[in-house]
Amino acid sequence: MKESGGDDRPRCTFSFLVIAIRIALLTLVLCGTACAQDHYDVVIHGGRILDPETSLDAVRDVGIRGGQIVAISERPLAGSRVIDATGLIVAPGFIDLHQHDQTAAAYRLKAMDGVTTALELEIGSPDVRKFLDQRRNAALINYGTSASQPWARAAVLGQPVVEGAIVPPSGPATNGPANPEQVQRIEQRLREELNAGGLGVGIGIQYTPGASRLEIIEMFRVAAERGRPVFVHVRGDRLESVEEVIAAAAVTGAPLHIVHINSSCLRDAPECLRLVAGARARGLDVTTEAYPYIAGMTQINSARFNPGWKEKDGIDYSDLMIPSTGERLTKERFEQMRASQQPQSIIIVDNTQAMVDQVIANPLTMIASDGLPGHPRNAGTFGRVFAQYVRERQSLTLMDAVRKMSYMPALRLERSTPEARKKGRLQVGADADLVILDLAAFHDQSTFEKPFEPSIGVRFLLVNGSPVIDGGAIVPGVTPGRAIVGSPAP
């Protein structure tokens, strides 16, 4: 018997077609969303990425969007700009906690040396708000400063700011005592500077020898009130000076960072580092730094050269050198320069290579340049560490060097600002401050004869996701640097 009804095949075919179209449309919508999510502003392709916090060391692609790292992938990623990093090192940009020279020219040198953030923390700025305003929307790399104890003290004791000076000149405002009312006024100025964005309190005890131990403790208390670190240039008596500031940190609770322990302690540096290690083992928040040169630099009219400097440091006039000419000083030339009203920097040859090598290799030390114009460390500190300590001496592993230059400084800053938690790491969610370098080629070129020669070997540098070095050259006209400021008052 023949069944009733027509042929259902056209209807089935039509239904299948409708379903297929719907699936295709849904797939297109979902794929479009996914494709939009997976397309990045910048992709770094095929580089060997290093994250010093997690110890990740692997070849990956890195996706960047909106100034942040948003993807790290074993598979290739797509982006508006793809940087081929095959055979190159990709690491968090270096953070220099100790950079006095905060000019546009210095920022270019720092960038060529792999630095994405350069901060003036040892001495700080006499006017934090002015410092930040001058650089807003005009900086190649990130910047910031501390509140300045030397300049606050000088202002209260009657010494105006000297244009071009890093520290106040030696005089009554640096060498004389402050009475209780003056100490209170210094404290108040520092609180105001912290409120303006200071990352901590910069304390130059050797540059203000008139400040008693009790006065210094009160400056530590100002930082401790806000949970900010103190960044300290110690008094100059080596072991006793380090003991003084560790004790001040212990009684006030202020986080303590001791600057350039290599030059502050010289031949006593190993014992000074043991003091730091002992303090840390007992729960104190104490950190330190070093730079890879046997010579330091400071202003000749500062209290650093008050009477007795030769005996204290075991050096003579001939160990002092004029940066621009290489001239070694005599007593007469020293006194002539010392009497000048203009701030003049002088190089001090006062350390040994063996001692510097020991300090740089110590796990406690971060790398920081103490950058000043005329000294090669202003241009070449980080490249020098890679060349001499990673490649040549092999006293640092590649990861150790990156950790000392990026992650450890970021950890130090976390007590100052939450922004630091996104610095010094190569992780999803971190700021895209990244250095891409040729490990075999990265080295310093600056010397005492040619201190302004930039390092070579950094192929690309990104600051907040924007390339500032592209193919080994500075990108003209870009200013992606941002202020790193202290947390608001509670």
PLM regions and their residue ranges:
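Active-site microenvironment of metallo-dependent hydrolases
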Residues: 25-26, 34-60, 64-65, 73-74, ...
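Active-site metal-binding motif and surrounding structural segment of the metallo-beta-lactamase
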Residues: 75-91
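Bacterial N-terminal signal peptides
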Residues: 18-32
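Alpha-helix-loop-beta-strand connector modules within alpha/beta enzyme cores
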Residues: 138-143, 219-228
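Divalent-metal coordination cores built from histidine and acidic residues
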Residues: 85-90, 99, 104-202, 284, ...
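Active-site neighborhoods of metal-dependent hydrolases
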Residues: 155-213, 246-250, 255-398
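Hydrophobic faces of well-ordered beta-strands that scaffold small-molecule active sites
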Residues: 93-99, 120, 143-145, 201-203, ...
